[in-house]
Amino acid sequence: MRYIRLCIISLLATLPLAVHASPQPLEQIKLSESQLSGRVGMIEMDLASGRTLTAWRADERFPMMSTFKVVLCGAVLARVDAGDEQLERKIHYRQQDLVDYSPVSEKHLADGMTVGELCAAAITMSDNSAANLLLATVGGPAGLTAFLRQIGDNVTRLDRWETELNEALPGDARDTTTPASMAATLRKLLTSQRLSARSQLQLLQWMVDDRVAGPLIRSVLPAGWFIADKTGASERGARGIVALLGPNNKAERIVVIYLRDTPASMAERNQQIAGIGAALIEHWQR
Protein backbone atom coordinates (compact mmCIF):
# COMPACT_ATOMS: atom_id res chain seq x y z
CA MET A 1 0.00 0.00 0.00
CA ARG A 2 2.84 2.38 0.89
CA TYR A 3 4.46 1.62 -2.48
CA ILE A 4 1.21 2.41 -4.33
CA ARG A 5 0.83 5.66 -2.40
CA LEU A 6 4.38 6.71 -3.30
CA CYS A 7 3.70 5.91 -6.95
CA ILE A 8 0.57 8.05 -6.92
CA ILE A 9 2.47 10.95 -5.35
CA SER A 10 5.21 10.61 -7.96
CA LEU A 11 2.64 10.55 -10.75
CA LEU A 12 0.90 13.66 -9.42
CA ALA A 13 4.23 15.47 -9.31
CA THR A 14 4.60 15.00 -13.07
CA LEU A 15 1.21 16.49 -13.94
CA PRO A 16 0.94 20.07 -15.26
CA LEU A 17 1.02 22.78 -12.62
CA ALA A 18 -2.53 23.88 -13.42
CA VAL A 19 -3.80 20.64 -11.86
CA HIS A 20 -2.33 21.61 -8.47
CA ALA A 21 -2.98 25.35 -8.53
CA SER A 22 -5.81 26.75 -6.50
CA PRO A 23 -8.65 27.58 -8.88
CA GLN A 24 -9.23 30.96 -7.28
CA PRO A 25 -7.22 33.14 -9.73
CA LEU A 26 -8.60 31.21 -12.70
CA GLU A 27 -12.13 31.49 -11.36
CA GLN A 28 -11.64 35.25 -11.08
CA ILE A 29 -10.45 35.36 -14.69
CA LYS A 30 -13.48 33.39 -15.87
CA LEU A 31 -15.72 35.76 -13.93
CA SER A 32 -13.94 38.73 -15.50
CA GLU A 33 -14.48 37.33 -18.98
CA SER A 34 -18.16 36.92 -18.24
CA GLN A 35 -18.52 40.43 -16.85
CA LEU A 36 -16.46 41.99 -19.63
CA SER A 37 -18.05 39.97 -22.45
CA GLY A 38 -14.53 39.77 -23.83
CA ARG A 39 -11.34 37.75 -23.63
CA VAL A 40 -8.69 37.74 -20.92
CA GLY A 41 -5.17 36.44 -21.35
CA MET A 42 -2.91 36.00 -18.33
CA ILE A 43 0.28 34.38 -17.18
CA GLU A 44 2.03 34.33 -13.82
CA MET A 45 5.68 33.29 -14.15
CA ASP A 46 8.42 32.75 -11.60
CA LEU A 47 11.13 35.30 -12.40
CA ALA A 48 14.07 33.17 -11.28
CA SER A 49 13.15 29.87 -12.94
CA GLY A 50 10.78 30.89 -15.72
CA ARG A 51 8.25 28.34 -14.47
CA THR A 52 4.61 29.05 -15.30
CA LEU A 53 2.53 29.23 -12.13
CA THR A 54 -0.87 30.20 -13.51
CA ALA A 55 -2.04 30.71 -17.08
CA TRP A 56 -5.19 31.45 -19.06
CA ARG A 57 -5.23 31.91 -22.84
CA ALA A 58 -1.49 32.39 -22.48
CA ASP A 59 -0.78 31.44 -26.10
CA GLU A 60 -3.54 33.52 -27.68
CA ARG A 61 -2.77 36.82 -29.37
CA PHE A 62 -3.65 40.13 -27.73
CA PRO A 63 -2.87 43.73 -28.75
CA MET A 64 0.27 44.98 -27.01
CA MET A 65 -0.76 48.62 -26.98
CA SER A 66 1.70 50.64 -24.89
CA THR A 67 3.14 47.60 -23.11
CA PHE A 68 5.46 47.35 -26.14
CA LYS A 69 7.35 50.35 -24.76
CA VAL A 70 9.14 48.15 -22.23
CA VAL A 71 10.47 45.94 -25.01
CA LEU A 72 11.33 49.04 -27.05
CA CYS A 73 13.46 50.48 -24.26
CA GLY A 74 15.02 47.05 -23.80
CA ALA A 75 16.09 47.21 -27.45
CA VAL A 76 17.45 50.72 -26.92
CA LEU A 77 19.46 49.54 -23.90
CA ALA A 78 20.83 46.62 -25.93
CA ARG A 79 22.17 49.17 -28.41
CA VAL A 80 23.68 51.13 -25.52
CA ASP A 81 25.41 47.99 -24.25
CA ALA A 82 26.75 47.32 -27.76
CA GLY A 83 28.19 50.83 -28.00
CA ASP A 84 25.76 51.85 -30.75
CA GLU A 85 23.74 54.28 -28.63
CA GLN A 86 24.13 56.57 -25.63
CA LEU A 87 21.44 57.38 -23.10
CA GLU A 88 22.89 60.90 -22.92
CA ARG A 89 22.53 61.56 -26.66
CA LYS A 90 20.17 64.45 -27.32
CA ILE A 91 17.43 64.03 -29.91
CA HIS A 92 15.78 67.12 -31.38
CA TYR A 93 12.35 66.99 -32.98
CA ARG A 94 9.65 69.24 -34.42
CA GLN A 95 6.01 69.97 -33.80
CA GLN A 96 5.01 67.70 -36.67
CA ASP A 97 6.75 64.79 -34.92
CA LEU A 98 4.30 64.96 -32.02
CA VAL A 99 1.29 62.64 -31.87
CA ASP A 100 -1.64 62.40 -29.51
CA TYR A 101 -0.80 61.99 -25.82
CA SER A 102 2.74 63.30 -25.47
CA PRO A 103 2.67 64.90 -22.00
CA VAL A 104 6.45 65.06 -21.61
CA SER A 105 7.85 65.43 -25.12
CA GLU A 106 5.48 68.27 -26.02
CA LYS A 107 7.21 70.39 -23.37
CA HIS A 108 10.67 69.97 -24.88
CA LEU A 109 10.29 71.11 -28.48
CA ALA A 110 12.83 73.85 -27.93
CA ASP A 111 15.56 71.86 -26.18
CA GLY A 112 14.94 68.25 -27.23
CA MET A 113 15.34 65.20 -24.99
CA THR A 114 18.04 62.64 -24.38
CA VAL A 115 17.54 59.00 -25.27
CA GLY A 116 17.34 58.17 -21.58
CA GLU A 117 14.77 60.89 -20.98
CA LEU A 118 12.70 59.59 -23.88
CA CYS A 119 12.72 56.07 -22.43
CA ALA A 120 11.69 57.42 -19.04
CA ALA A 121 8.84 59.38 -20.65
CA ALA A 122 7.72 56.40 -22.75
CA ILE A 123 7.54 54.02 -19.79
CA THR A 124 6.64 56.20 -16.81
CA MET A 125 4.16 58.46 -18.61
CA SER A 126 3.41 56.35 -21.72
CA ASP A 127 4.44 59.28 -23.92
CA ASN A 128 3.62 58.28 -27.51
CA SER A 129 5.89 60.73 -29.31
CA ALA A 130 8.80 59.62 -27.12
CA ALA A 131 8.09 56.04 -28.20
CA ASN A 132 8.07 56.99 -31.88
CA LEU A 133 11.35 58.88 -31.56
CA LEU A 134 12.90 55.84 -29.90
CA LEU A 135 11.41 53.48 -32.49
CA ALA A 136 13.22 55.43 -35.18
CA THR A 137 16.55 54.68 -33.46
CA VAL A 138 16.02 50.90 -33.58
CA GLY A 139 14.81 50.71 -37.19
CA GLY A 140 11.10 51.29 -36.71
CA PRO A 141 8.52 48.57 -36.05
CA ALA A 142 10.38 46.14 -38.32
CA GLY A 143 13.61 46.80 -36.45
CA LEU A 144 12.00 46.15 -33.09
CA THR A 145 10.44 42.94 -34.40
CA ALA A 146 13.86 41.88 -35.67
CA PHE A 147 15.30 42.50 -32.19
CA LEU A 148 12.60 40.28 -30.72
CA ARG A 149 13.49 37.50 -33.15
CA GLN A 150 17.17 37.85 -32.22
CA ILE A 151 16.41 37.24 -28.55
CA GLY A 152 14.23 34.23 -29.31
CA ASP A 153 10.73 35.71 -29.35
CA ASN A 154 9.16 34.39 -32.55
CA VAL A 155 5.64 35.52 -31.69
CA THR A 156 5.58 39.18 -30.66
CA ARG A 157 5.38 41.61 -33.56
CA LEU A 158 5.19 45.36 -33.98
CA ASP A 159 3.85 46.56 -37.32
CA ARG A 160 2.90 50.20 -36.85
CA TRP A 161 3.84 53.36 -35.01
CA GLU A 162 2.03 55.25 -32.30
CA THR A 163 -0.83 55.81 -32.24
CA GLU A 164 -2.09 53.47 -34.99
CA LEU A 165 -0.67 50.41 -33.22
CA ASN A 166 -3.42 50.73 -30.60
CA GLU A 167 -6.21 50.05 -33.11
CA ALA A 168 -6.90 46.56 -31.67
CA LEU A 169 -9.19 45.32 -34.42
CA PRO A 170 -10.77 41.90 -33.70
CA GLY A 171 -8.75 39.15 -35.36
CA ASP A 172 -5.91 41.48 -36.40
CA ALA A 173 -2.48 39.96 -35.71
CA ARG A 174 -0.65 43.25 -36.17
CA ASP A 175 1.02 44.74 -33.11
CA THR A 176 0.24 41.71 -30.95
CA THR A 177 1.88 39.32 -28.56
CA THR A 178 0.79 36.46 -26.32
CA PRO A 179 0.95 36.60 -22.52
CA ALA A 180 3.45 33.74 -22.53
CA SER A 181 5.72 35.37 -25.11
CA MET A 182 5.66 38.77 -23.44
CA ALA A 183 6.47 37.26 -20.04
CA ALA A 184 9.34 35.20 -21.47
CA THR A 185 10.75 38.21 -23.31
CA LEU A 186 10.55 40.42 -20.24
CA ARG A 187 12.30 37.73 -18.23
CA LYS A 188 15.09 37.50 -20.82
CA LEU A 189 15.60 41.25 -20.73
CA LEU A 190 15.77 41.34 -16.94
CA THR A 191 17.63 38.14 -16.05
CA SER A 192 19.70 36.89 -19.00
CA GLN A 193 22.82 38.27 -20.60
CA ARG A 194 20.77 40.01 -23.30
CA LEU A 195 21.32 43.20 -21.31
CA SER A 196 24.12 44.23 -18.97
CA ALA A 197 23.36 44.29 -15.26
CA ARG A 198 23.35 48.08 -15.38
CA SER A 199 20.84 48.14 -18.23
CA GLN A 200 18.64 45.57 -16.49
CA LEU A 201 18.49 47.77 -13.40
CA GLN A 202 17.72 50.82 -15.51
CA LEU A 203 14.86 49.10 -17.34
CA LEU A 204 13.44 47.87 -14.06
CA GLN A 205 13.71 51.31 -12.47
CA TRP A 206 11.76 52.93 -15.29
CA MET A 207 8.99 50.40 -14.64
CA VAL A 208 9.12 51.04 -10.90
CA ASP A 209 8.64 54.74 -11.64
CA ASP A 210 5.48 54.14 -13.73
CA ARG A 211 3.06 56.98 -12.97
CA VAL A 212 0.01 55.96 -15.01
CA ALA A 213 -0.75 52.50 -13.60
CA GLY A 214 -2.44 53.52 -10.36
CA PRO A 215 -5.94 52.08 -11.01
CA LEU A 216 -4.66 48.60 -11.89
CA ILE A 217 -2.59 46.19 -9.78
CA ARG A 218 -1.02 49.01 -7.78
CA SER A 219 -4.47 49.76 -6.36
CA VAL A 220 -4.63 46.35 -4.63
CA LEU A 221 -0.96 45.93 -3.71
CA PRO A 222 -0.36 45.11 -0.03
CA ALA A 223 2.00 47.30 1.97
CA GLY A 224 5.64 46.34 1.56
CA TRP A 225 5.16 44.67 -1.81
CA PHE A 226 7.30 45.42 -4.85
CA ILE A 227 5.82 46.39 -8.19
CA ALA A 228 7.28 47.52 -11.49
CA ASP A 229 4.87 47.74 -14.40
CA LYS A 230 3.79 49.14 -17.75
CA THR A 231 0.23 49.44 -18.94
CA GLY A 232 -1.45 49.67 -22.33
CA ALA A 233 -4.87 50.85 -23.47
CA SER A 234 -7.00 51.05 -26.58
CA GLU A 235 -10.30 52.77 -27.22
CA ARG A 236 -11.43 49.60 -29.01
CA GLY A 237 -12.00 47.22 -26.11
CA ALA A 238 -8.45 46.37 -25.05
CA ARG A 239 -6.32 46.91 -21.95
CA GLY A 240 -3.12 45.38 -20.65
CA ILE A 241 -0.39 45.35 -18.05
CA VAL A 242 3.02 43.72 -17.71
CA ALA A 243 4.35 43.71 -14.16
CA LEU A 244 6.88 42.32 -11.74
CA LEU A 245 5.57 41.64 -8.25
CA GLY A 246 6.70 40.31 -4.92
CA PRO A 247 6.44 40.61 -1.15
CA ASN A 248 9.22 42.08 1.00
CA ASN A 249 9.93 44.62 -1.74
CA LYS A 250 11.44 41.97 -4.02
CA ALA A 251 10.60 41.19 -7.64
CA GLU A 252 9.72 37.48 -7.63
CA ARG A 253 7.15 36.94 -10.36
CA ILE A 254 6.14 38.30 -13.73
CA VAL A 255 2.44 38.89 -14.28
CA VAL A 256 1.04 39.69 -17.72
CA ILE A 257 -2.66 40.43 -18.17
CA TYR A 258 -4.34 41.43 -21.43
CA LEU A 259 -7.99 42.13 -22.24
CA ARG A 260 -9.50 42.40 -25.69
CA ASP A 261 -12.82 42.62 -27.55
CA THR A 262 -14.79 43.97 -24.60
CA PRO A 263 -17.47 46.68 -24.73
CA ALA A 264 -16.70 47.59 -21.11
CA SER A 265 -15.61 51.09 -20.16
CA MET A 266 -11.97 51.84 -19.33
CA ALA A 267 -12.89 52.10 -15.65
CA GLU A 268 -14.49 48.64 -15.78
CA ARG A 269 -11.44 47.20 -17.54
CA ASN A 270 -9.19 48.69 -14.87
CA GLN A 271 -11.38 47.23 -12.15
CA GLN A 272 -11.27 43.74 -13.66
CA ILE A 273 -7.48 43.78 -14.00
CA ALA A 274 -7.22 44.96 -10.40
CA GLY A 275 -9.52 42.10 -9.37
CA ILE A 276 -7.37 39.54 -11.15
CA GLY A 277 -4.29 41.02 -9.53
CA ALA A 278 -5.94 40.84 -6.10
CA ALA A 279 -6.83 37.18 -6.65
CA LEU A 280 -3.24 36.35 -7.62
CA ILE A 281 -1.88 38.15 -4.57
CA GLU A 282 -4.34 36.44 -2.23
CA HIS A 283 -3.45 33.04 -3.69
CA TRP A 284 0.24 33.90 -3.34
CA GLN A 285 -0.11 34.69 0.37
CA ARG A 286 -1.74 31.36 1.27
From Swiss-Prot:
In the UniProt record, does the keyword Signal occur?
Answer: yes
Record-linked PROSITE patterns: BETA_LACTAMASE_A
Q: Which reaction does it catalyse?
A: a beta-lactam + H2O = a substituted beta-amino acid
Q: What is its EC number?
A: 3.5.2.6
Write down a Pfam family by its short name: Beta-lactamase2
InterPro entries according to UniProt: Beta-lactam/transpept-like (IPR012338), Beta-lactam_cat (IPR045155), Beta-lactam_class-A (IPR000871), Beta-lactam_class-A_AS (IPR023650)
Q: Does the keyword Disulfide bond apply?
A: yes
State one molecular function term (GO).
beta-lactamase activity
> Catalytic center at which residues?
66 (acyl-ester intermediate), 164 (proton acceptor)
Q: Name one GO biological process term.
A: response to antibiotic
Q: Report the leader peptide range.
A: 1-21
* UniProt keyword annotations, A-Z: Antibiotic resistance, Disulfide bond, Hydrolase, Plasmid, Signal
Q: Which residues bind substrate?
A: 230-232
**Disulfide linkage:** 73-119
| EC top class named in words | hydrolase
The remark listed among the other comments is: The class A beta-lactamase family has a specific amino-acid numbering system, sometimes called Ambler or ABL numbering and often misspelt as Amber. A multiple sequence alignment was used to derive a consensus sequence and then the consensus was numbered taking into account insertions and deletions. This allows use of identical numbers, e.g. for active site residues, despite differences in protein length. UniProt always uses natural numbering of residues, hence there appear to be differences in numbering between this entry and some papers.
Q: Which family does it belong to?
A: Belongs to the class-A beta-lactamase family.
Explain the purpose of this protein.
This enzyme hydrolyzes cefotaxime, ceftazidime and other broad spectrum cephalosporins.
Q: What is this protein called?
A: Beta-lactamase SHV-3
Underlying gene: bla
